[in-house]
């Protein structure tokens, strides 16, 4: 299924401390969370794709859908950050391929950011 044909369920919440969106990919094959608050800005977290559905473009579709929501509902130009375990070189490389850059690193976590997406 082409990325443009994917379907998502988006659940939005407003909290005292900010807003969250949870995006679920077609038939529950994967999900990602967007959080926005005054302290941390916009953060992607919890990207998860069921093992049998990996390497089929679902993770990429979820990240791109999250970026679309940030552009349209939060505002274009808002930086998006995320954290990856520093030992997970494959995932760091994948996020780099998607356009994210490392902006902070320690032995436990690598912080990545995308701007002008």
Can you say where each PLM-predicted feature lies in the sequence?
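A conserved beta-strand-loop-helix scaffold within acyl/acetyltransferase catalytic domains
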Residues: 32-39
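Conserved acetyl-CoA-binding loop-helix of GNAT-fold acetyltransferases
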Residues: 49, 55-69, 93, 97
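Conserved beta-strand-loop-alpha-helix junction that forms the acyl-donor binding cleft
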Residues: 80-92, 108-117
């Amino acid at each position: 299924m082409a990325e443009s044909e994917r379907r998502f369920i988006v659940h939005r919440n407003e909290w005292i401390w900010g807003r969250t969106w949870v995006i679920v990919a077609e038939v529950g094959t994967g999900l990602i969370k967007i959080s926005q608050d005054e302290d941390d800005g916009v953060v992607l977290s919890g990207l998860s794709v069921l093992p049998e559905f990996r390497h089929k473009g679902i993770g990429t579709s979820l990240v791109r859908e999250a970026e679309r929501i940030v552009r349209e509902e939060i505002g274009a130009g808002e930086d998006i950050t995320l954290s990856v375990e520093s030992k997970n070189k494959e995932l760091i490389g994948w996020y780099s391929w998607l356009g994210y850059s490392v902006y902070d690193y320690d032995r436990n976590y690598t912080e990545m950011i995308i701007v002008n997406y």
